[in-house]
Amino acid sequence: MRYLLCTLMAIFFFAPVTYADNGIISIKSSHDVKTTVDRLENILREKGMTVFIRINHAEGAQKVGKKLRPTELIIFGNPKVGTPLMQCGQSVGIDLPQKALIWQDEAGQVWLSYNDPKYLASRHSIKECVEIIKKIEKVLGNFARVATMP
């Protein structure tokens, strides 16, 4: 049990995360795109989130004769979380429901990317509701870690 706890803590604290200046958090995945999206979709449903749609951008590109590395978008949310956030700043609704982009870069590395909740708060001038933003940060980070870890 102690070993498991230490392992989980190491994954949590040392997970490869990249913060971009544009408000996107990207986490390296240990899996291919499809597996990462499948894992994310499963954890979202297990935790009571609504998965609205899963979009395979590479398939869309192929339909018009274009090539695109594996890239999928999953759109999900829960009004229990989204509504209070919109009550703090209704314009944040343009960025809701939440989205996660799972994509493969030119080197073959798979990433799971999502909007940084702090960035959304700043973008929509949400100065209150700090606890809601913290909760969303924690939940999204947990979902991403579960989907991407070995």
Protein language model annotation of sequence segments:
Residues M1-L4:
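Positively charged n-region of N-terminal signal peptides that target proteins for export
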Residues C6-A15:
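Bacterial N-terminal signal peptides
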Residues Y19-T50, R145:
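Terminal, regulation- and interaction-focused segments at domain boundaries
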Residues S26-K28, L73-I75, L101, W111-S113:
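Soluble periplasmic/extracytoplasmic beta-strand elements of cell-envelope proteins
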Residues T36, L40, H57, I132, ...:
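Stable alpha-helical elements in mature extracytoplasmic
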Residues R45, N56-Q98, I102:
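Compact, glycine-rich, soluble single-domain proteins
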Residues K99-I126:
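Beta-strand/loop substructures that line and gate deep hydrophobic ligand-binding cavities in soluble
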Residues K118-P150:
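C-terminal partner/receptor-binding element of secreted or periplasmic proteins
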